[in-house]
Amino acid sequence: MPSHFDTLQLHAGQEKTADAHNPRAVPIYATTSYVFNDSKHGAQLFGLETPGYIYSRIMNPTLDVLEKRLAALEGGIAALATSSGQAAQTLAVTGLAHTGDNIVSTSFLYGGTYNQFKVAFKRLGIEARFVDGDKPEDFEKLFDEKTKALYLESIGNPKYNVPDFEKIVAVAHKHGIPVVVDNTFGAGGFFCQPIKYGADIVTHSATKWIGGHGVTVGGVIIDSGKFPWKDYPEKFPQFSQPSEGYHGLIFNDAFGPAAFIGHVRTELLRDLGPVLSPFAGFLLLQGLETLSLRGERHGSNALKLAQYLESSPYVSWVSYPGLPSHSHHENAKKYLENGFGGVLSFGVKDLPNASEESDPFKASGAQVVDNLKLASNLANVGDSKTLVIAPYFTTHQQLTDEEKLASGVTKDLIRVSVGTEFIDDIIADFEASFATVFNGQKPE
């Protein structure tokens, strides 16, 4: 099987089947269930004694191709598609941590993730402990015998910090703690492959660069197959002790290195039900086929826009890991490839005579967003079209003011998911908006 990313995104996971029509494209298997060969075959499938399909809440042939393809792109051994990125996070964390346990993470997170960890997981009895930053020694200070995961983002949203994966993984593994990385901004493995640097589990909002066109919501969990669950039977009994739901089946024995993804699929996905539809899976497969082509343009456009903004007299600061001025630029050069990602943030200088008490929606930054014509003001990233948003008032709105600042979210921050349009048109859109807002006035 070819091993290059550009080829895998087109071919991985699709094997010739017994379909009499021999379709070249991956078919949409719009079926709820699958006919057993006989009664014994049905019993074997339900007992996890033989591989195969039972019901599309657990497995579906369309999704099977998607899962295998994403696992290949990320360097994992198995994957599980879910109904959204939030669902992927939920299953990944609850597959490791139970009531009374804790996970350790950073304040440098997407607002929806931070809120899910702080509020929703608390209701499940799972404590989330947040470090202000991403230094390995700071994470280690929060570990105890009940810590079941260290959770990071490969490119933090919205600070775009790139963690020092190798050092962080070494600290976590020293304590028998698996590392879970949300690689959404790593674009399906195109910009970043955390498993290569020791991460154990990778999640994605497949809605973003994997789908790439803003047409469907989905998520995925990828299992590296490398964490030694058998070495920690008391810490992770769900893999080493008999399963109550499968008459004593032991996941470590039944699934080997894929024990984690096997457990999440056959117990959590089965019982909680956040399944991806085959129609959505098909759309994500369509997106995957051009991922490297789009990713290259996203990355080059983002760097050029960041450089333009950094030189603009209307801009007070720019945050993009591809700029030497970014605090994590050296880590970005070490851990990112094919570019530095497709998202950046910047702040706009104040209009003359602006005051702290002014209506925030009349501030220069809000006006710049409102006067953009090509870029769309909406809550998404990874679309082929350029998108903008003010996270302080939207994606991170549920956080307290202190939590927003800890996450790197300020009132003047404008996040840009840079699309694949011609870069001169993107820059011209921002230039025209600046000219309209400032109208010949010098920024303060």
Swiss-Prot record:
UniProt cofactor(s): pyridoxal 5'-phosphate
GO biological process, one term: L-homocysteine biosynthetic process
Stored Gene3D superfamilies: Aspartate Aminotransferase, domain 1, Type I PLP-dependent aspartate aminotransferase-like (Major domain)
Catalytic activity: O-acetyl-L-homoserine + methanethiol = L-methionine + acetate + H(+); O-acetyl-L-homoserine + hydrogen sulfide = L-homocysteine + acetate; O-acetyl-L-serine + hydrogen sulfide = L-cysteine + acetate
Enzyme class: transferase
Pfam families associated with the record: Cys_Met_Meta_PP (PF01053)
UniProt main location, coarse: cytoplasm
Pathway(s) annotated for this protein in UniProt: Amino-acid biosynthesis; L-methionine biosynthesis via de novo pathway; L-homocysteine from O-acetyl-L-homoserine; Amino-acid biosynthesis; L-cysteine biosynthesis; L-cysteine from L-serine: step 2/2
Claim: Transmembrane helix is one of the keywords in the record: no
Location in or out of the cell: Cytoplasm
EC identifiers of the protein: 2.5.1.47, 2.5.1.49
GO cellular component, one term: cytoplasm
Gene Ontology terms for molecular function: cysteine synthase activity; O-acetylhomoserine sulfhydrylase activity; pyridoxal phosphate binding
Residue numbers carrying N6-(pyridoxal phosphate)lysine: K208
Keywords (A to Z) from UniProt: Amino-acid biosynthesis, Cysteine biosynthesis, Cytoplasm, Methionine biosynthesis, Pyridoxal phosphate, Transferase
Recorded family membership: Belongs to the trans-sulfuration enzymes family.
Role played: Catalyzes the conversion of O-acetyl-L-homoserine (OAH) into homocysteine in the methionine biosynthesis pathway. Also catalyzes the conversion of O-acetylserine (OAS) into cysteine, the last step in the cysteine biosynthesis pathway.
Binding partners and assembly: Homotetramer.
Alphabetical list of PANTHER family matching this protein: HOMOCYSTEINE/CYSTEINE SYNTHASE, HOMOCYSTEINE_CYSTEINE SYNTHASE
This protein's name: Homocysteine/cysteine synthase
Originating species: Kluyveromyces lactis (strain ATCC 8585 / CBS 2359 / DSM 70799 / NBRC 1267 / NRRL Y-1140 / WM37) (Yeast)
